């Protein structure tokens, strides 16, 4: 089984979450990003796609600006750092399509040891870009998505957590998608989910 751990997230405050939410960095063109960040200074693309402001996409300045933009968002209170480690339940609702996920950290060793199967082949230049971006900003700004086999126990635990509290966020964003997120901080519950 893959090891998962809670983490201290840097996340949007509740008031700005719908403005900060953005499309994944790799599904929008340079011209689309420029328009989106011009129209919305709170868009997370201001951090995730700083390359659009430079002639050379992999210049050191690209990654330094990402680090500076992340600090600026935090200084302005648009992004806040969690006090304690947490797991997050993430629900996406688009039309009649409903998906649930668990936001967590995983061990790279689980991938190296074959416990996580590769589902796509990524371009080495894009991998290098994201590694530099994460290293320089000291943040994972582009999480990866994993899928897993059906797990009735986990499904039950996550439903119980959703039913026990109001979500941290519930907002509509791009593509008519509703995003709903619950935070789990109770150590016993986290341990139960990890098992």
Task: Locate the predicted segments by residue.
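A cross-family signal for N-terminal binding/gating loops and helix N-caps
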Residues: 1-194
């Amino acid at each position: 089984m893959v090891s998962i751990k809670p983490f201290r997230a840097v996340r949007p405050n509740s008031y700005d979450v719908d403005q900060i939410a953005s499309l994944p960095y790799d599904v929008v063109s340079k011209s689309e990003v420029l328009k989106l960040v011009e129209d919305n200074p709170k868009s997370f693309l201001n951090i995730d796609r700083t390359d659009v402001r430079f002639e050379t996409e992999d210049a050191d300045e690209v990654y330094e600006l990402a680090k500076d933009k992340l600090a600026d968002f935090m200084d302005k209170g648009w992004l806040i750092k969690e006090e304690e480690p947490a797991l997050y339940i993430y629900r996406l609702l688009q039309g009649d399509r409903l998906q649930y996920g668990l936001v967590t950290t995983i061990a790279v060793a689980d991938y190296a040891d074959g416990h996580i199967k590769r589902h796509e082949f990524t371009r080495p230049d894009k991998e290098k870009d994201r590694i530099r971006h994460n290293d320089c900003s000291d943040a994972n700004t582009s999480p990866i998505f994993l899928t897993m086999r059906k797990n009735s126990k986990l499904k039950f635990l996550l439903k119980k957590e959703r039913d026990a509290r109001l979500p941290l966020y519930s907002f509509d964003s791009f593509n008519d998608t509703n995003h709903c997120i619950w935070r789990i901080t109770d150590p016993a519950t986290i341990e139960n989910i990890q098992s």
